[in-house]
Regions:
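Glycine-rich phosphate-binding loop and adjoining helix at the ATP-binding site
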Residues: 71, 75-174
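N-terminal helix-turn-helix
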Residues: 1-22
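Gly/Thr-rich phosphate-binding beta-strand-loop-beta motif of the actin/hexokinase/Hsp70
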Residues: 33-69, 177-190, 231
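A mobile "lid/hinge" subdomain adjacent to the ATP/sugar-phosphate binding pocket shared
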Residues: 225-268
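Hydrophobic "anchor" residues
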Residues: 67, 124, 194-195
Length: 268
């Protein structure tokens, strides 16, 4: 345990650096009213990139975890790798230009990405859904362009950490998280530790073959889990059942909303 003088020293250093600020006073129960301290949201910022494909979401958040700016890119499914990367960099650049006043206080970029990765190198090895996306040195590219620290990890693994932090009790230390997105992935938490594998690819279940004679998957195999239950498969099936040529892309959350609102096809 930290001693009272040590805690006060840490708090004072945070005040000097502008990380915490006075937040008023609590009602006294006797003696001097206790002073409240708050995180100064403007003290630091971070960029998050949710690289799911065909959707990429970019957000700028402050130290209080409040999103102050965002971008969303929806690609056509046949978009080439070079265009995907170039447009993502361009949108990130535009976001930084819009919030140029806080640029000196941005501490880093975090990327949650689909597909297989080499986490220790910040490299995206392969994304089946993007033509030509092979061994993209995402960490190096972002660091060289924006001169910020960059962290790359599997998107579903990061979502599992969010689920744990926001919605689960502290004693829920063991669980399996299934992420149904444009593809399907999973994450395993054991004794509060994410079992993500040596390079961050544990739980890569979307291309597990369920039926060798099943529907064609984007990976070239038949009957993968993704080909049955991933968002791309659900969108394709929805268009078939509704005889629709609508190019709108529905997420799993969208399908659930449609179902609750009485959409018969979504309910199937």
């Amino acid at each position: 345990l930290l001693s009272r003088p040590t805690i006060l020293e840490i708090i004072n250093s945070f005040k000097e650096e502008g990380i915490v600020v006075n937040g008023g006073f609590r009602e006294s129960t006797g003696g001097r009213p206790p002073q409240l301290l708050c995180i100064n949201g403007d003290s630091a910022y971070a960029i998050g990139i949710d690289f799911e494909f065909p959707t990429i979401r970019i957000a700028l958040a402050n130290a209080k975890r409040e999103i102050v700016g965002r971008r969303k890119i929806l690609f056509k499914i046949d978009t080439q790798a070079e265009e995907v990367l170039a447009r993502m960099l361009r949108e990130l650049e535009h976001l930084l230009e819009e919030f140029s006043s806080v640029r000196p206080r941005i501490v880093g970029i975090g990327v949650g990405i689909c597909g297989t990765i080499r986490k220790t190198e910040g490299r995206s090895l392969h994304i089946t859904r993007i033509r030509g996306w092979e061994h993209v040195e995402l960490q190096r590219i972002l660091q060289e362009k924006f001169h910020l620290p960059v962290y790359v990890n599997n998107d579903v693994h990061l979502l599992a950490l969010v689920e744990k932090k926001k919605y689960m009790r502290e004693d829920n230390s063991d669980f399996v998280y299934i992420g149904i997105r444009s593809g399907i992935g999973s994450a395993y938490m054991y004794q509060n530790k994410l079992m993500d594998g040596v390079q961050g690819n544990a739980g890569y279940i979307g291309h597990t073959v369920l039926n060798a004679e099943g529907p064609m998957c984007v990976c070239g195999n038949r009957g993968c889990l993704d080909a049955y239950a991933g968002e791309l498969a659900l969108n394709r099936r929805y268009q078939e059942l509704t005889n629709s040529e609508n190019e709108s892309y529905y997420t799993m959350r969208d399908f659930m909303k449609l179902s609750r609102n009485g959409d018969a096809v979504s309910q199937k």
